[in-house]
Amino acid sequence: MQDKLNQIKELALVEIKEAKDSTTIDTIRVKYLGKKGELTTILRGMGSLSKEERPIVGKLANEVREVLEAELEAVTKAVKEAEKQEKLKNEVIDISMPGKKQTIGKKHPLEQTLDEMKKIFVSMGFAIEDGPEVEKDYYNFEALNIPKNHPARSEQDTFYINDNVVLRTQTSPVQARVMEKQQPPIKMISPGKVFRSDAVDATHSPIFYQMEGLVIDKDITFADLKGTLELFAKKMFGDKVKTKFRPHHFPFTEPSAEMDATCFVCNGKGCKVCKGEGWIEILGCGMVHPQVLRNCGIDPEVYSGFAFGFGVDRMVMLKYGIDDIRLLYESDMRFLNQF
């Protein structure tokens, strides 16, 4: 048994010294020291030895194990260092090769346009207000002069969570909340996400962005509304832009209008963006309805005001000539990298 142990030791040491890579070393380790290795097999068979032989063989076997483990560790370190140096040698950097372009983050075109619009209105003295996206029915409808059974309450247009709670269909509820808690003068915008129960297509999305504005004070007239929005249009689209107002109907304003601007693609000459008309619809607006003021605790005999609202997605599409709203929400970097 002792001769066999010495023989295993000599053979193993020879194999270890000849090992040139980590795989060979692992194979040798398993061959001699593994669960079914040659040295392990001898240790398991010591029960058949006499009492006199058992301690002698056991001591020798442990000495052989210690020698092999020490040698394996030393050779493993040397081999791994050699492999590392070989890898570094083969991975020489060619400094003449062009570098890899770093991916640089940028703002989404929606965010860019929102920031630009907010900057313009803040420069005109407007404050930015925010409110909940999950809104009470009262603030989304009744406070804004949209009573029960009004067509705008149709389940086809609105996401109802329950009878009294909806996903806001506009950012106008923010205006109602501000009027309730703050006495005039009020000058604010309320940008944010809104929700409509619309089927997804090139021009409709169930989630989109709006920015609405409100001014309340004494002696506010339609001329103030017109001047404010014309100034915004010039700052947003350039000094040469022209605007016009068309009569319209909104339940929360009276009188109401829609504002058009000369097409900034063709400068009013007519193109596919403006459908040959030379004008593009930009926003809805009007003088705040007296009932809305009363609902929010403001005396319409003392105060008046105007309100307006933009579809931010529409502004982005018009500004950049985008013909499908879905492109704004698909996170396609080939598209987004153009902005």
Curated annotation (Swiss-Prot):
CC cofactor note: Binds 2 magnesium ions per tetramer.
InterPro entries, per the entry: aa-tRNA-synth_II (IPR006195), aa-tRNA-synth_II/BPL/LPL (IPR045864), Phe-tRNA-synth_IIc_asu (IPR004529), Phe-tRNA_ligase_II_N (IPR004188), Phe_tRNA_ligase_alpha1_bac (IPR022911), Phenylalanyl-tRNA_Synthase (IPR002319), tRNA-bd_arm (IPR010978)
Catalysis: reaction(s): tRNA(Phe) + L-phenylalanine + ATP = L-phenylalanyl-tRNA(Phe) + AMP + diphosphate + H(+)
Pfam families referenced in this protein's UniProt entry, alphabetically: Phe_tRNA-synt_N, tRNA-synt_2d
GO biological process annotation, one example: phenylalanyl-tRNA aminoacylation
Enzyme class label: ligase
Entry keyword annotation includes Protein biosynthesis: yes
SUPFAM superfamilies documented for this protein: Class II aaRS and biotin synthetases, tRNA-binding arm
Top-level division of the source organism's lineage: Bacteria
GO molecular function list: ATP binding; catalytic activity, acting on a protein; magnesium ion binding; phenylalanine-tRNA ligase activity; transferase activity; tRNA binding
Keyword tags: Aminoacyl-tRNA synthetase, ATP-binding, Cytoplasm, Ligase, Magnesium, Metal-binding, Nucleotide-binding, Protein biosynthesis
Co-factor(s): Mg(2+)
Coarse class of the protein's main subcellular location: cytoplasm
Localization: Cytoplasm
A cellular component term, taken from the record's GO annotations: cytoplasm
Binding site for Mg(2+): 254
EC number of this enzyme: 6.1.1.20
Keyword hit for Transcription: no
Self-association and partners: Tetramer of two alpha and two beta subunits.
HAMAP family assigned to the protein according to its UniProt record, in alphabetical order: Phe_tRNA_synth_alpha1
Family affiliation: Belongs to the class-II aminoacyl-tRNA synthetase family. Phe-tRNA synthetase alpha subunit type 1 subfamily.
The protein's name: Phenylalanine--tRNA ligase alpha subunit
Organism, scientific name: Clostridium perfringens (strain ATCC 13124 / DSM 756 / JCM 1290 / NCIMB 6125 / NCTC 8237 / Type A)
Gene symbol of the encoding locus: pheS
